[in-house]
């Protein structure tokens, strides 16, 4: 398994925004970017957790604008590629171009796993202005491997250099990942890269990322201390340790990543990013990982167990963008409980 070249994409400052409710100072952004850059990651993604223009009452407002965070990152970045995320319908072409003007040179255009067609304009525009572009098929567990691969092919046809298996709910197990990566490889052009974005909800993020690489993935998402939505993303320092054991090629300094994770990122967390009864339920139910904080808030307000809310969200097959439905579920379940008590 040696001589595999891995492109390490850090998501601490994008997916990790969910873990701190999109609240981080530009000063801390600079500290994290400086540490990641020195540690040798290939790319650093910066944006609100729900991508450019994601700050809203539905998704959660940010402590700062995307532009303030991106400017802070660009100011100290020396080596890594500055990346951002955009969800069509949330972020616009205008915002994509403004991000480019601020120094962003790579974008991941994200859609639900069966809605790749809405990414066409954004992928095409990103290519036109000279950006590296990846397609990001979220909630990849909700589509069979063959259907997901067809969606990946659409993104490739629009101009994506890479398409991701994006396990937003942390629901995929190793065989699921292998099946999806192989299906991508069977249908995509040889020159199109494949990426993996894993979550830790079932404690499988490193294992899933390793299996993905073994089956042909070259771009791997990870974050310091696993800092991300739900139980977090693939912990960067743990993945790099495995990559070293497997003798895969990458430019990362393991000890520097460990130091950044423990000394900079963990102290910022107001809720531990870990597998616990709530985050495990996210993966078990196949629920979008960013629903965690919304479900916890609704649980506290309406007195319904977080796990009950998440199981119902999974039963309803809710997807990213439907965070407001958590309150609807809580109200419905609270009314049922009151009726049963009478």
Curated annotation (Swiss-Prot):
What's the name of the protein?
Answer: 4-hydroxy-2-oxovalerate aldolase 2
Q: Which family does it belong to?
A: Belongs to the 4-hydroxy-2-oxovalerate aldolase family.
Has UniProt tagged this entry with the keyword Heme?
no
Enumerate the residues marked as the site Transition state stabilizer. Answer: 14
In this protein, which residues make up the domain named Pyruvate carboxyltransferase? 6-258
Q: Which organism is it from?
A: Rhodococcus erythropolis (strain PR4 / NBRC 100887)
**Residues reported to bind Mn(2+):** 15, 197, 199
Q: Which Gene3D superfamilies match?
A: 1.10.8.60, Aldolase class I
For molecular function, the Gene Ontology terms on record are:
2-isopropylmalate synthase activity; 4-hydroxy-2-oxovalerate aldolase activity; manganese ion binding
One of the protein's GO biological processes: catabolic process
- What reaction does this enzyme carry out catalytically? (S)-4-hydroxy-2-oxopentanoate = acetaldehyde + pyruvate
State where substrate binds: 14-15, 168, 197, 288
What Pfam families does the record point to?
A: DmpG_comm, HMGL-like
Q: What is its EC number?
A: 4.1.3.39
Keyword annotations for this protein, in alphabetical order, are: Aromatic hydrocarbons catabolism, Lyase, Manganese, Metal-binding
Q: Which CDD domains match?
A: DRE_TIM_HOA
Q: Which InterPro entries match?
A: 2-IPM_HCS-like, 4OH_2_O-val_aldolase, Aldolase_TIM, DmpG_comm, DRE_TIM_HOA, PYR_CT
- Active site positions: 18
């Amino acid at each position: 398994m040696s001589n595999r070249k891995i492109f390490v994409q850090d998501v601490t400052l994008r997916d990790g925004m969910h873990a701190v409710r999109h609240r981080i100072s530009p000063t801390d952004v600079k500290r994290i970017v400086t540490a990641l850059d020195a540690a040798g990651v290939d790319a650093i993604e910066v944006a609100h957790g729900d991508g450019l223009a994601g700050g809203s009452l539905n998704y959660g407002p940010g402590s700062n604008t995307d532009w303030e965070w991106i400017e802070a990152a660009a100011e100290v970045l020396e080596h890594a590629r500055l990346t951002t995320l955009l969800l069509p319908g949330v972020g616009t072409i205008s915002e994509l171009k403004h991000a480019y003007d601020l120094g962003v040179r790579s974008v991941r255009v994200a859609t639900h796993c069966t809605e790749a067609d809405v990414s066409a304009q954004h992928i095409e525009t990103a290519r036109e202005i000279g950006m590296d572009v990846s397609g990001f098929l979220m909630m990849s567990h909700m589509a069979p491997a063959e259907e997901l691969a067809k969606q990946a092919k659409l993104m490739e046809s629009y101009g994506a250099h890479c398409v991701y298996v994006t396990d937003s709910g942390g629901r995929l197990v190793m065989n699921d990942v292998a099946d999806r990566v192989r299906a991508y490889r069977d249908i995509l052009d040889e020159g199109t890269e494949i990426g993996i974005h894993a979550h830790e909800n079932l404690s499988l993020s490193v294992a899933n990322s390793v299996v993905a690489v073994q089956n042909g993935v070259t771009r791997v998402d990870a974050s310091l201390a696993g800092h991300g939505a739900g139980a977090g993303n693939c912990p960067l320092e743990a993945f790099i340790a495995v990559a070293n054991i497997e003798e895969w090629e990458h430019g990362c300094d393991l000890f520097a990543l460990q130091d950044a994770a423990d000394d900079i990122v963990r102290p910022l967390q107001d809720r531990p990013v870990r597998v616990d009864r709530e985050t495990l339920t996210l993966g078990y139910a196949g629920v979008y990982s960013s629903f965690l904080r919304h479900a916890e808030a609704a649980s506290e307000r309406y007195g319904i167990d977080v796990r009950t809310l998440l199981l119902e969200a999974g039963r309803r097959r809710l997807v990213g963008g439907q965070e407001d439905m958590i309150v609807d579920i809580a109200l419905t379940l609270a009314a049922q409980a009151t009726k049963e008590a009478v």
